[in-house]
Amino acid sequence: MTKEGVLELDSYRLLPYAVQVPCYVCEGGNAYDAELCRHCLAPMALGHQAANQKIQPRMVATIGPAAVGKTVYLGMLIDMLSRQSTGMQMLARGAFSIRLQQGVIGALRRCEFPQKTPNEPDRWNWVHCQVKSPEQRRPIELIMPDMAGEAILEEVDHAHSYPVIRMFLKKCAGLMILIDGEKVHDGTLDQDYFAMKLLTFLSELDDDPKTGWTKRPVALIFTKSDQCPELEENPAAFAQAHTPGLWQQTCERFHHHKFFATGVAGGTAFRQPRGQGRVRIPLRIEPHGVTAPFEWIVRSLGK
């Protein structure tokens, strides 16, 4: 004997997947509940937050070779601006935007430097923040990732190795390039070569005479300036004397640039863990010149 019945179909649950949600970085379509973009591995939270705001976020890149101090600089910058009660202030958007700040400050409190940024894009820390300045009537929204230096170099040498890097740099409104001032002072040429390759890559990435990289603000930041008093006195003169290739290329191709010197650790030492190589540790934290490059970038974007 066959009984009749009504079976409810659950196909309505598939309706949200019929509409693709674009990634804010590469604009590729993704499922509405995706955590990372399936094309470039950028957080989909960026796109969801941007869709609910009237002010569209702008992108600012902080890049440099491996071990230049990029993660420490970004974490300290965010921590300082988020705690200021006057002047330029920063407000994080989303819990994921606090992860970088928390990791860096936690490591420095333990008298350690944070671990090297992994090369895998799905493990990078992204920051979406609102920046308020007394000089500007309206706040601006910024997106800043902590990209691995080795991954950046790989994309420069081998195009499309990391699509997220190419797409992000193409859309960036401003750039902060970090250069190891201690290595430059010691005569190492790798820092000069890396910066020149990167600037050449950027000029070819978007060469539009009106909106390309020749018109965008570029801050060149020498890190670890506490190890070199000459650098702190005059960063531009230091660049001209010790990195002539970088100096010449910057002046010829990038009309809106400025050199800076910054440092976070007031002094460093080495310790020898058992069974491991020497590890550099900070003896004390004395940040100086950390906010100046970022403030210059923000003011340039507001013009």
Q: Which residues does each PLM region occupy?
A:
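Catalytic micro-motifs at enzyme active sites that drive phosphoryl/nucleotidyl and oxygen chemistry
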Residues: 47-49, 113-120, 128-134, 163-166, ...
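A broadly conserved sequence feature marking short terminus-proximal activation segments
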Residues: 1-15, 129-140, 300-303
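Extended non-core architectural segments that shape protein topology and connectivity
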Residues: 2-4, 37, 41
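Switch II of P-loop NTPase G domains
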Residues: 121-173, 184-189
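Conserved GTP-binding G-domain of TRAFAC-class P-loop NTPases and closely related GTPase folds
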Residues: 163-303
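Conserved G1/Walker A P-loop phosphate-binding module
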Residues: 16-25, 29, 33-35, 42-120, ...
